[in-house]
């Protein structure tokens, strides 16, 4: 059976299991995580990405100087539309 090509995703989720044989030699066995571990890893990464997006949004919000109510409304609507669009496509 052919081994799939390594990608950053598979490299980051692979684990090497080193075992000592009876004669003292060490053997390495590459273990791929099961689907539950892979999904947990994926969800953890995506949660970190989402938190980063939210943090960046609020930093921009707090950096506004003397905004008017209308400029805030316009800015919030633009950012909200952009955020939702990116959230569904990525």
UniProtKB/Swiss-Prot annotation:
Residues 7-16, 24-39 have a biased composition (Polar residues). Its main location: host cell. Keywords: Apoptosis, Host cytoplasm, Host membrane, Host mitochondrion, Host mitochondrion inner membrane, Host nucleus, Host-virus interaction, Inhibition of host innate immune response by virus, Inhibition of host MAVS by virus, Inhibition of host RLR pathway by virus, Membrane, Modulation of host cell apoptosis by virus, Viral immunoevasion. Residues 1-39 are annotated as: Disordered. One of its GO terms (cellular component) is membrane. It is found in: Host mitochondrion inner membrane; Host nucleus; Host cytoplasm, Host cytosol. It holds the Pfam family PB1-F2. GO terms for biological process: symbiont-mediated perturbation of host apoptosis; symbiont-mediated suppression of host cytoplasmic pattern recognition receptor signaling pathway via inhibition of MAVS activity. The record marks 66 as: Low pathogenicity. It comes from the Viruses. Residues 65-87 are annotated as: Mitochondrial targeting sequence. Plays an important role in promoting lung pathology in both primary viral infection and secondary bacterial infection. Promotes alteration of mitochondrial morphology, dissipation of mitochondrial membrane potential, and cell death. Alternatively, inhibits the production of interferon in the infected cell at the level of host mitochondrial antiviral signaling MAVS. Its level of expression differs greatly depending on which cell type is infected, in a manner that is independent of the levels of expression of other viral proteins. Monocytic cells are more affected than epithelial cells. Oligomer. Interacts with human SLC25A6/ANT3 and VDAC1. Interacts with host MAVS. Is not encoded in all strains, and seems to be dispensable for replication. Belongs to the influenza viruses PB1-F2 family. This is Protein PB1-F2. It comes from Influenza A virus (strain A/Chicken/Pennsylvania/1370/1983 H5N2).
């Amino acid at each position: 059976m052919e081994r799939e090509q390594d990608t950053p995703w598979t490299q980051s989720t692979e684990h090497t299991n080193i075992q000592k044989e009876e004669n003292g030699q060490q053997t390495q066995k590459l273990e791929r995580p099961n689907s539950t571990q892979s999904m947990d890893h994926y969800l953890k990464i995506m949660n970190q990405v989402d938190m980063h997006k939210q943090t960046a949004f609020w930093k921009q919000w707090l950096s506004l100087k003397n905004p008017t109510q209308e400029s805030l409304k316009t800015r919030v609507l633009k950012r909200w539309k952009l955020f939702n669009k990116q959230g569904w496509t990525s």
